[in-house]
Amino acid sequence: VLSTAREMADFDVLCMQEVSVNYPVLTRQTDGDQPAVVARLLPGFQVFFSAAIDELSACGTYRQKFGNLIATRLPVRTVEHVALPYPNPVTQEVTPSMQRICQVTTVQAPWGPLRVMTTHLEYYSQVMRHAQAVACRDLHLQGCALADFPSKTEKGTPYQPKPLTTDTVICGDFNFEQDSAEHASMIQPHQTHTLYNAWNQLNGSAAHPSTFRLYDRTYGPEPVGCDFFFVSESLKHRVQRFAVNQETKVSDHQPVLLELN
């Protein structure tokens, strides 16, 4: 996976979903600590893992974790791990579900602080997924409000100055499509801090490239696009390149690249 990512670009920030620790069923009996593997294979990068699931194994002898990861060679100013809503879907059909999380990492980009958010939303329940999408947008708006109206600070304490910014990138496996209500909620207009689908910034109204079910049809008959980059109003002019590798089969999702100038 990392080799494929590096073939796409000499990246500064890497966002990964479905990263696990001690789930041999998921890792196919390979090295069980995937965040450690990423750190080992990316010298010069800092690796931050957000566990949506952190539980004791069934045998009671070790911990199991599952979540998202951000690796970057840029200076990292702050890291937050935010649990997303987990509402009861209230449906007759009983489906699997789990807690979801959004990692919010602020890095120092060449032009200033940049908030990078990565997540993996609910797959089965549209009710849960929509609530989580709204929460991701709200996190962005909350960060922008703090930048617009900074709090009083106290040096040398947890209240010390923070790298406040309105520049936001939100990416990940959203498990919704471009014509969904969830996508509409993500890009709902805001007076000053609207989010935009980065693909459409370069390609107008063209359909987003398929990123899921191209080669593995376990979860449906047709390929769909559900892995997006959203950028803030303040950042949309920096969108320079967007690419999807639709040739690789290293994952059931295709890797997506965003380049900012």
How does the language model describe each region?
Residues V21-D33, S57-G60:
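Short, flexible/disordered intra-domain loops and linkers
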Residues V19, A52-D54:
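Short linear capping/connector segments at secondary-structure termini
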Residues D31-V37, L41, S50-A51, V134-A135:
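Preference for well-ordered, secondary-structure-rich cores of eukaryotic proteins
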Residues V1-V13, Q46, D54-L56, G60-N261:
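Active-site regions of metal-assisted phosphoester/phosphodiester hydrolases
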